[in-house]
């Protein structure tokens, strides 16, 4: 099962890296590729929630987290929202562990150094209230109306607040270090 899960990761990481290859593409999958990008994001979220522990201690974990971060940074709030459950899962697994286990027996997922700080940086940038006056403004191409845009971005900001609260509650020292830039 481990080998099969890794093979699935490798199969999907290629298209993810291709879609999100350059900084410009981190921001936009392009309208014509949006459905594919959303399906790819959903697949990676589902895979991550079930198998990310298999990547622990390898360079693949950093690659996977960077891909998920790129999806979170996407200008389409629908894509970014797809990643929220994964981030909540990752915070729980890396900072709290399985809460049904006694504290002394909990095993935490080891995430790369500096990752909490990077996640907080993205959260802060996504928390900025976006401005969209007309559907001619970017990223309006992803939304049916200005109202739809504002509703989706508000929902995203609320979910990001939830992640921030979990981080602050679970690892206040790590959050404090990240805020100080250390």
Task: Describe each model-derived feature in a short phrase.
Residues 66, 74-182:
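Alpha-helical repeat/alpha-solenoid scaffolds of the HEAT/ARM/MIF4G superfamily
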């Amino acid at each position: 099962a481990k080998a099969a899960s890794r093979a699935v990761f490798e199969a999907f990481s290629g298209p993810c890296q291709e879609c999100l290859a350059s900084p410009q593409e981190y921001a936009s999958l392009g309208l014509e590729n949006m459905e594919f990008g959303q399906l790819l994001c959903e697949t990676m979220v589902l895979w991550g929630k079930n198998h990310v522990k298999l990547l622990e201690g390898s360079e693949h974990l950093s690659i996977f987290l960077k891909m998920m971060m790129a999806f979170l940074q996407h200008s389409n709030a629908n894509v970014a929202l797809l990643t929220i459950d994964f981030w909540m899962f990752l915070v729980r697994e890396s900072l709290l562990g399985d809460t049904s286990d006694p504290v002394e027996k909990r095993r935490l997922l080891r995430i790369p150094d500096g990752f909490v700080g990077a996640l907080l940086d993205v959260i802060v940038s996504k928390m900025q209230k976006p401005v969209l006056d007309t559907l001619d403004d970017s990223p309006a191409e992803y939304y049916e109306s200005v109202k739809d845009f504002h509703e989706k971005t508000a929902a995203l900001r609320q979910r990001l607040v939830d992640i921030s609260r979990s981080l602050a509650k679970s690892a206040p020292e790590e959050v404090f270090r990240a805020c100080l830039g250390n």
